[in-house]
Amino acid sequence: MVMLDTLANALTTIYNNEVRGNKEAIIMPASKLIANVLRIMQKEGYVGEFEYIDDGRWGKIRVRLLGRINKCGAIKPRVSVSYRDLLVLPEHLRRFLPSKDVGILIISTSQGLMTHKEAIQKRVGGIAIAYVY
C-alpha cells in the first residue's frame, strides 16, 4: 500500500484516537516533519509527551493525548500565505479555524515550522500545512 501524505495520516490517527477517548496514539511511519508538528502541538498544550520507537523499519511515534483536541488535520492542497494574509486570515484559511483567536495554523517558513501567531510576530510568510483547535 502506498502512503501519499504521512502528515495527514498522522493527524487523522491523532484525531481518531482523541475522539475514541484513548490516552495514547501510535503514529507510523515516523518522520522529522511529524515530530516537528508534534513539538509545536506539545508547546501549545494540545498533546503531551511523545517518544520515537525504532522498530527496524520506518519507526513509530507514541503520543500521549490530553483530550484537548477538537479537530486537527492537514491542509490540502498546501496553501501559500504571505505575512499580510496572516494578519487578515483570508476565506480559504478562515474555514480551518472556528475563530481568529481559537486554534493554530502550522506554517512551514524559511525559518522552520511555526504557528501562525509566531509567523505574524516574526513577519514571515510560508505554506500552511496543518491546523489544530
From Swiss-Prot:
Record GO terms (molecular function): rRNA binding; structural constituent of ribosome
Family stated for the protein in its record:
Belongs to the universal ribosomal protein uS8 family.
One GO CC term of this entry? ribonucleoprotein complex
State whether it acts alone or in a complex, and with which partners, per the record: Part of the 30S ribosomal subunit.
GO BP annotations listed: translation
For this protein, the record's SUPFAM superfamilies field holds: Ribosomal protein S8
Q: What lineage is on file?
A: Archaea, Thermoproteota, Thermoprotei, Desulfurococcales, Desulfurococcaceae
Kindly state which keywords UniProt assigns to this record, in alphabetical order: Ribonucleoprotein, Ribosomal protein, RNA-binding, rRNA-binding
Q: Which Pfam families match?
A: Ribosomal_S8
RNA-binding is among the record's keywords: yes
Its protein name is: Small ribosomal subunit protein uS8
Question: Could you confirm whether the keyword Cell wall biogenesis/degradation appears in this record?
Answer: no
**According to its UniProt entry, what is the function of this protein?**
One of the primary rRNA binding proteins, it binds directly to 16S rRNA central domain where it helps coordinate assembly of the platform of the 30S subunit.
In terms of domain of life, where is this protein from? Archaea
